[in-house]
Amino acid sequence: MSQFSCVGLIGRLDSDNAAYSLRRLISFLAKQNIEVMLDEETAEFYTENELEIVSRETLAKRCDLIIVVGGDGSLLSAARAFAGKPVKLLGINRGRLGFLTDISPDEIEYKVGEVLAGKYVSESRFLLHSQLYRGEELISEAVALNDVVMHPGQFIRMIEFELYINDEFVYRQRSDGLIISSPTGATAYALSCGGPIMHPSLDAIVLVPMNPHTLSSRPIVVHGSSRIRLLIAKDNHLSPHITNDGQTHVVTKPGDEVVVTKSPDLLELIHPTDHNFYETCRSKLGWASHTGGC
């Protein structure tokens, strides 16, 4: 008997491979005596089904498990929609790296079957909450599972800004931008810019400069409860962009402030019982395997 009563499905929209895996998953779930629903955005591209098609808001209310078929980008989008909701997320990898979507396509029936039987490990991941202020006015706010990034947008020019942590001045910097990353995002964009790998269970945030003009500027790891504030210098000759998980963005103006804190809403992410963070790092990042001892 399944531990879950209703499963919601979300698929990558531009992938024939994802569509194939989604068909396999639907066929498997049809035999499990479980109510299954399909995300309405996915249904626009995947019409070969007789499932109930609903919004993500409805999925959050009626489902207790969401299965995402796609890459990490697909799961990032789902994470922002379902964080703080009483629903768990499981990922089937039809993307590239797959740090978050860790079930391979050839294991769908076996691994998903184990999860439905209650054989899984669950972990809570925190998200970042970003706010853009223009004077006293709140211009926009968003959440991100991986990272909040300040960057020049379409222009190749340096940004000048000041960094404050818990209202304490840290530095004034000229660089291509700054990556503010959660532990989940530490193996994504932050890693490619020289940031440290952090275990996802850590209550910490890492700030990674992008091509800083000062060689001594290095990534800083701060406590997860920190309030991070960026003051965009008024003499900037461009309007930096703030991007959340590489998927949503807002354009700032010189003199704006960006405040990033830990969101109170947690994401419940589940994995197969054999999930191991360090094994994932070895396989995804190409680390050397054990060869019999030193």
Swiss-Prot record:
Keyword Cell inner membrane among record annotations: no
Keywords: ATP-binding, Cytoplasm, Kinase, NAD, NADP, Nucleotide-binding, Transferase
Reaction catalyzed: NAD(+) + ATP = ADP + NADP(+) + H(+)
Residue intervals passing through the bilayer: none
Cofactor: a divalent metal cation
Residues that coordinate or bind NAD(+): D72, G73, N146, D147, R157, R174, D176, T187, A188, Y189, A190, L191, S192, Q247
Residues spanning the signal sequence: none
Keyword Transferase: yes
Active-site residue numbers: D72
EC top class named in words: transferase
Compartments it resides in: Cytoplasm
Gene Ontology terms: biological process: NAD metabolic process; NADP biosynthetic process
GO cellular component: cytoplasm
A Pfam cross-reference name: NAD_kinase_C
The enzyme's E.C. designation: 2.7.1.23
GO MF annotation list: ATP binding; metal ion binding; NAD binding; NAD+ kinase activity
Protein family (similarity comment): Belongs to the NAD kinase family.
Function: Involved in the regulation of the intracellular balance of NAD and NADP, and is a key enzyme in the biosynthesis of NADP. Catalyzes specifically the phosphorylation on 2'-hydroxyl of the adenosine moiety of NAD to yield NADP.
Entry protein name: NAD kinase
The species this protein was found in: Saccharophagus degradans (strain 2-40 / ATCC 43961 / DSM 17024)
Upper classification of the organism: Bacteria, Pseudomonadati, Pseudomonadota, Gammaproteobacteria, Cellvibrionales
